[in-house]
Amino acid sequence: MLQFITIPNLMDYRVTLKLMEDYVNKVISDNEPEIVYLVEHSEVYTAGTNYKQEELLNYGDIPVIYTGRGGKFTFHGPGQRVIYPILNLASPNRHKDLKLYIKMLEEWIINSLNYFGIKTYIIKDKVGIWVKVRKGEFAKIAAIGVRVRKWVTYHGVAINISTDLSKFSGIIPCGLENSLVTSLNQLGIHIEMSEFDKIIQTEFNKIFK
């Protein structure tokens, strides 16, 4: 069974990035076992490889870090669970298929949120997991941005639990102008991070056996 490592304190994004990259190298060179990091970051805006500078609107005192993951700008901060699976897609029980991997991540998040009775949506050409908040309007509750090196995955998923959603106003999230974001709290669901972690770990192990 996969090992989940929960980092208890707010983590600087740059420290986490080095942690991930170092472990990816160990998986590649030393065949270290797969792991999943569960992290909560201090406030940061991150840019994926497809970002446009004009999508960074007003970042104030919040640091901006340019990463190697897919996607565009997003926000990480307290109250958001960020999950970094480091999986070896070249191993016998996996598949060398990045699209399939992302589809499995989507299925895992959908199943986890379904636990709370939240109906979720995947919208064509809009990466992430969405919920309907008003007639004809959808808000993103989870972002996905991954990278693969020699078929070992890193970066991952960010799910808004009790995130300060106002911080997303400093960017055009994921390059989608006028897009909305939401959280479990905003949807009326209040849960401790540790309890949420139990659910996502259970559902993760069902998908990534």
Swiss-Prot record:
<comment type="similarity">
    <text>Belongs to the LipB family.</text>
</comment>
<keyword id="KW-0963">Cytoplasm</keyword>
<comment type="function">
    <text>Catalyzes the transfer of endogenously produced octanoic acid from octanoyl-acyl-carrier-protein onto the lipoyl domains of lipoate-dependent enzymes. Lipoyl-ACP can also act as a substrate although octanoyl-ACP is likely to be the physiological substrate.</text>
</comment>
<dbReference type="InterPro" id="IPR020605">
    <property type="entry name" value="Octanoyltransferase_CS"/>
</dbReference>
<dbReference type="InterPro" id="IPR045864">
    <property type="entry name" value="aa-tRNA-synth_II/BPL/LPL"/>
</dbReference>
<feature type="binding site">
    <location>
        <begin position="143"/>
        <end position="145"/>
    </location>
    <ligand>
        <name>substrate</name>
    </ligand>
</feature>
<feature type="binding site">
    <location>
        <begin position="156"/>
        <end position="158"/>
    </location>
    <ligand>
        <name>substrate</name>
    </ligand>
</feature>
<dbReference type="InterPro" id="IPR000544">
    <property type="entry name" value="Octanoyltransferase"/>
</dbReference>
<keyword id="KW-0012">Acyltransferase</keyword>
<keyword id="KW-0808">Transferase</keyword>
<dbReference type="GO" id="GO:0036211">
    <property type="term" value="P:protein modification process"/>
</dbReference>
<comment type="pathway">
    <text>Protein modification; protein lipoylation via endogenous pathway; protein N(6)-(lipoyl)lysine from octanoyl-[acyl-carrier-protein]: step 1/2.</text>
</comment>
<dbReference type="Pfam" id="PF21948">
    <property type="entry name" value="LplA-B_cat"/>
</dbReference>
<feature type="site" description="Lowers pKa of active site Cys">
    <location>
        <position position="140"/>
    </location>
</feature>
<dbReference type="GO" id="GO:0005737">
    <property type="term" value="C:cytoplasm"/>
</dbReference>
<dbReference type="InterPro" id="IPR004143">
    <property type="entry name" value="BPL_LPL_catalytic"/>
</dbReference>
<dbReference type="GO" id="GO:0033819">
    <property type="term" value="F:lipoyl(octanoyl) transferase activity"/>
</dbReference>
<feature type="domain" description="BPL/LPL catalytic">
    <location>
        <begin position="30"/>
        <end position="209"/>
    </location>
</feature>
<protein>
    <recommendedName>
        <fullName>Octanoyltransferase</fullName>
        <ecNumber>2.3.1.181</ecNumber>
    </recommendedName>
</protein>
<feature type="active site" description="Acyl-thioester intermediate">
    <location>
        <position position="174"/>
    </location>
</feature>
<feature type="binding site">
    <location>
        <begin position="69"/>
        <end position="76"/>
    </location>
    <ligand>
        <name>substrate</name>
    </ligand>
</feature>
